[in-house]
Amino acid sequence: MTRQEVFNWCRQQYGTEPEYPWNDWNAVLRHTDNQKWYGLIMEVSRDKLGLSGDGEVDILNVKSDPMLIGSYRTQEGFFAAYHMNKENWISILLDKPELDDAIKKLLALSFELTTSKKKR
């Protein structure tokens, strides 16, 4: 999924729009009721993720179950959360079609984990 595809999917599933709190390319996905983040799309240098080559890539940070994070991090395209709590968040490389299903599942889980306690 590209960042735009993530935004479109979240709009269809949750009725949320990306927000740009830092007036740059990085976008936050948040609940409309409690304002909690369930996703963060950032552009980061490849070297910050241990990837070869020059330039930057888009990643998606989502909240997840710590048990799942350990399992996902053994797979290509998943990383310790960049600029987030590494125990509860994971970074996923975007623009890798083979990760699309996992991205949707993890976005859904992140949305659920950050939902207001009243709604659970």
Question: Which residues are covered by each model-predicted region?
Answer:
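Charge-dense, helix-prone N-terminal extensions
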Residues: 1-120
